[in-house]
Each structure stands twice: as structure tokens, then as C-alpha cells.
A protein has these predicted regions:
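Phosphate-handling substructures
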Residues: 26-30, 34-48, 90-149
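Short, active-site-adjacent cap segments at secondary-structure transitions
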Residues: 26, 80-81, 104, 171-173
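Cofactor-binding loop segments of dinucleotide-utilizing enzymes, especially the Rossmann-like FAD-
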Residues: 22, 100, 168
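Active-site-proximal alpha-helix that buttresses catalytic centers in soluble enzyme cores
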Residues: 3, 8-97
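Acidic, low-complexity terminal tails and accessory targeting/binding regions
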Residues: 2-17, 35, 60-63, 96-118, ...
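A short, acidic, amphipathic alpha-helical segment used as a generic capping/interface helix at domain edges
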Residues: 146-158
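Conserved glycosyltransferase catalytic-site signature
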Residues: 77, 81, 151, 169
Length: 193
């Protein structure tokens, strides 16, 4: 596991964030349904961790730097919440659920609910470096919108100096330089809000 310290130039209250990407999700139970399309989009967020994902989350819960944290805040998505639960059990820290710490939204209009459409939206997102081009067939969440959503939600926790946030890779990449973030990877950074 890689641990990095990232200093971002933001004004205001300084906060140390210990980001944790969620464990490996298990979509198989949703994919095996008679009508798996009923669980497309946010429906896929109901999937729990795989056995491997649970084991890795239990292992990462023992990470030494967690001892410096005051609270744990988790995305409300099942895979993040299950990961955060293991950390809370191990550390004894209070766990808060933050619905606005969710993953990147590939569909802001409710028009691209199938996997192919999501992949096309992601392709445009990457091609335009997190921006939204006029020729995009879908309106997805941009990097700027993701950062704004996260920072606005983070405001209510500004009285804490060190927090653990269990969330998703694309959201974490808005604040850390890592291009690839593994399941249960821990990355420390400082943010001013």
C-alpha cells in the first residue's frame, strides 16, 4: 500500500484527510438477476464487497496512521460503507455517512443507464480531461463539479483536524496526483477549506 502526503493550495481551515478507496465490489448477484438492468446506474451501488474485498478492508483497518484520525466519514455507497465499517470496528472511531462523497456521476440527465452509455461517457470524460465538451452525447459530472460537490460537503466537518474519508477512486483523484488508485489504498493529504 502506498502512503503519500499531498499539499493542495486552498485557503481557509487546514484539514488532514486520510483517503481510503473502498474494497473490491461484488456485482455478480446483481448481474445474475433475471432483469439486471433494474440495477443499473445507482442500483449497482447496492453491491457488497467480495470476500477478497472484505479481507483487504479488514487488513487496511489496522493501518497505523488511522490512530491520528478523529472520525471516519464514508460515502453512502455500500462498498465504501462496508469498508468504513471495518475501519470503525478496528479503530473505535465514530462513523459518519456522507451521501455527497459518492463516485463520479456518468449521467446527470438520466439518459445513459446502460453499461455501454456509461463507458462512452467515461471515454468523453477522459478525452476532455475531466471537462465536458459540446459534442458529448451525455452530460456527466466534470472534475470541477466533483471537486465542488466534495468541498461543499466537507465544510460541515471543518472543526476536525484529521479525518478518514472512505470513498471512490475518481473522487480521490481530484485531490491526489495518483492516476491509479487500488482497492483499499490509503493516501494522506492536506486540504484547506
Amino acid at each position: 500500500m502506498a502512503f503519500e502526503l499531498v499539499d493542495l493550495d486552498r485557503q481557509g481551515t487546514r484539514m488532514k484527510i486520510i483517503f481510503v478507496r473502498h474494497g473490491e465490489p461484488d456485482y455478480s448477484m446483481l448481474d445474475k438477476l433475471e432483469n439486471p438492468q433494474l440495477y443499473s446506474g445507482f442500483g449497482r451501488d447496492l453491491a457488497p464487497l467480495t470476500g477478497k474485498g472484505s479481507s483487504l478492508a479488514k487488513e487496511v483497518a489496522k493501518t497505523a496512521c488511522f490512530g491520528k484520525a478523529e472520525i471516519i466519514i464514508s460515502s453512502s455507497v455500500t462498498r465504501a460503507l462496508e469498508t468504513a465499517h471495518y475501519i470503525a470496528v478496528e479503530t473505535g472511531l465514530d462513523l459518519f455517512v456522507e451521501p455527497f462523497f459518492h463516485e463520479w456521476r456518468p449521467d446527470l440527465d438520466g439518459t445513459n443507464s446502460d453499461l455501454t452509455s456509461v463507458l462512452v461517457a467515461h471515454e468523453y470524460y477522459l478525452k476532455h480531461q475531466g471537462g465536458l465538451s459540446e459534442d458529448s452525447p451525455y452530460r456527466y459530472e466534470t472534475d470541477l463539479e466533483m471537486r465542488h460537490r466534495f468541498l461543499r460537503a466537507l465544510e460541515k466537518y471543518k472543526n476536525y483536524k484529521t479525518i478518514i474519508i472512505v470513498t471512490h477512486g475518481m473522487l480521490m483523484r481530484q485531490f491526489v496526483p495518483d492516476e491509479k488508485i487500488d482497492f483499499c489504498q490509503v493516501i494522506e493529504c492536506e486540504i484547506e477549506i
